[in-house]
Amino acid sequence: LETDLADGVNPAETEARTAERGLTYPFAGPPASGEAIRVAEDVLWMRVAMPMQLDHINVYAVRDGDGWAVVDCGLAIPGTKDEWELLLAGPMGGDPVTRVICTHMHPDHIGLAGWLCERFDAPLLMTRLEYVMARMLLADTGKTAPESGAAFYRAAGWDEEQIERYRKEFGRFGMAVAPLPASYQRIRDGERIVIGGRDWTVVVGEGHSPEHACLWRQDDGVVLGGDQILPRISSNVSVWPTEADADPLGDWLTSLERMKSVFPDDVLILPSHGEVFRGAQTRLEALIRGHHVALKRLARSLKEPKRAVDVFPALFARPVGDGVRGMATGEAIAHLNYMLLQGTAVRERDADGVDWWRSTTNGEEAA
């Protein structure tokens, strides 16, 4: 779930409004289906559709000798392979895929990685935590939901009908992800990998996923940003039942601060969603500021004890429906856990196993 949480930005805002925020878009618009835009030397920007409100993922091809290194892949659902066939035969000129690089393990990024790797006998490149987490989630496909997961959502304030829906939907990760290769090539933070004779530096971020990789071609300032720096929306930062006391928001904010010290403002950001843009420093600052503003709103809403599901209005501009309830709950708990670890909130569990959260500040100190 990518949301408009972090800067209060409506994804449909005008280009002029966005320009006022310090971002510029060098291209007139995104590529059409089956087509590509050359955004930098030897780099193609393409799109694959997704059947949801966030209706696309950007995928990129970087010239690599006689073929292409592909960055991210789209969901393994009907129609996506057909889109890839058009891209492979069209803008990619029928040349082979030399390697598949996935920025992180979310299904829209790795869904067809296994298919592309198998078709072209190409290696898969990922960070270790992302690969291992993907393999773990794939292994859960079709399994029964653990009771610890039900308890997690009960503690957040879900009713029994909602918990039953969680049980029915558990283990669906593999429904949109083709089987991954049994081996992979690890990429590490700070490592330089050579694509087409040019160096790309791996820059890792945490919070949205465990070990998200950006790739930075420093000689001309091109950054394959994945979900780390999106132009108009903020990447989901969630706590999940597997690690209920995690602090992904702390990890996310630390990563954003680090990115500020790494990327110059004029780099060309190639994001996974939205349009290619410049203004990295401005956007990173807005993402950080937005979460701190949200934390202050959250603290003010917690003058009286509330459950995680009760704080949605303080965090989200839109109503939360069943389709995104899990991600919204995870993001709410991420903010609550952050406050708990900062000492600005307390948590008490009642006899029914429900957690009640209360602020220890007036809201101004929460962030």
Identify the residue ranges that each predicted region occupies.
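C-terminal regulatory/interaction regions
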Residues: 1-26, 296-367
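Short Pro/Gly-enriched beta-strand edge/turn motifs at strand-loop
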Residues: 17, 40-46, 169-176, 196-198
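Conserved beta-strand hairpin/beta-sheet module of binuclear metal-dependent hydrolase folds
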Residues: 33-95, 215-231
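Divalent metal-coordination and catalytic microenvironments
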Residues: 42, 62, 72, 104, ...
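A short catalytic or substrate-binding loop motif that flags glycine-/basic-rich loops and adjacent residues
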Residues: 52-54, 185-187, 206-209, 365-367
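Metallo-beta-lactamase
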Residues: 68-78, 173-185, 192-194, 199-292
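Active-site HxH/HxHxD metal-binding segment of metal-dependent hydrolases
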Residues: 79-80, 85-194, 221
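Short hydrophobic/aromatic-enriched beta-strand-loop microsegments
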Residues: 121-128, 224-226, 287, 322
